[in-house]
Structures are given as C-alpha cells and as structure tokens.
Regions:
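Glycine-rich flavin
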Residues: 2-3, 13-14, 20, 24-28, ...
Length: 171
C-alpha cells in the first residue's frame, strides 16, 4: 500500500488545491486520479468547447450585420464538420498537454483509471491500494436526463453528446 499526503480525484478545478500544496510543500506526496480525459469538465465538455463554437457563430452574425455598414456580404456556407473538428483539435491538444504534464510531473503520481473506496481513507486504483489522510473528490458532473415519457424513443442530445456530432441538426 502506498501512502500519500493528498489524493485528488479529478483533474479540473480541484487541481488548484494540488498546485497550492505543491507550492507550499514541494516534497508532499500527492496522487492525482482521473478515469476520464484530464482537464476537467470545463475543458473537455463545458466552458471551453462552447466558447470555441460560439466564435464561428459570432463571425457569421458579424458578416450578416455588415450590410448595415454598407458592406455587401453574405455567408454562403458554414462547414459545420470543420467547425466541430477545429473545436475538438484545440481541446485534444490541451488534454494531451495536461496528460503529459501529469504523467511527467516529479511532484505527483498520476493514475489514469477509476478509483473506489475500499476502507476509510483508502482507495483501490486499478490493482493498487493507496491511502491518504486528505482526499479531494473533484469528480465533476453529468447531464441530468429528465424522466420525460417518450424521450428515449425520440432521441435527444446532452451537453456531452452535442460535442460529438459532426452533422448539423435540422433544428
């Protein structure tokens, strides 16, 4: 069993605590665990992807408003697939940088797999057992699917699945 001063589950906003601890005590033993893509929900399927998609939409709106300034312009086509690929490429670059930084860090051990409590202050990560007196649960959130009759048959998109589409929906 490996013992740590701090175990952090999640690589989003909880990493601020990890960074502060490293800054205060560079010799602290720290484990960071994330079964998903590192970077947290804001980077992987929240704030950042939505902002990257808003910018092209704002450009289209600006082009359409150009007529009010006497500029004859129009948007003939929006390559939705290219817009989505651009967003994904930017995000995956950041995810890969974070993963590399975590994997190569001399200040922490990075576990890219699921964790489960097996005893107080004790986690099983893969086949390893680790322990700490301080454990941060920064595990993010998931979309809530309301119990609407017929919703599953109709089909729906969530804030997670919308980022995976490559063809623009009709409505």
């Amino acid at each position: 069993m490996k013992e740590y001063d701090l175990i952090c589950i999640g690589t989003g906003s909880a990493m601020a605590v990890v960074e502060a601890m490293i800054s205060e005590n560079p010799k602290a033993k720290i484990a960071v665990i994330d079964k998903d893509k590192p970077g947290g929900i804001c980077l992987t399927r929240g704030c950042i992807p939505s902002k990257l998609l808003l910018y092209p939409a704002e450009l289209v709106r600006t082009i359409e408003k150009a007529r009010t300034f006497g500029i004859d312009s129009e948007t003939k086509n929006v390559d939705f697939k290219a817009v989505m690929e651009r967003m994904r490429n930017i995000i995956y670059k950041d995810i890969n940088k974070i993963r590399q930084g975590l994997s190569e860090s001399k200040h922490l051990d990075y576990y890219s797999e699921a964790a489960e409590f097996v005893a107080p202050y004790t986690l099983k990560v893969g086949k390893k057992i680790i322990k700490a007196k301080m454990i941060i649960l920064g595990t993010g959130s998931k979309p809530l699917i309301p119990p609407v009759k017929g919703l599953n048959e109709t089909g729906y998109l969530t804030s997670d699945t919308i980022l995976e589409i490559s063809k623009l929906a009709k409505s």
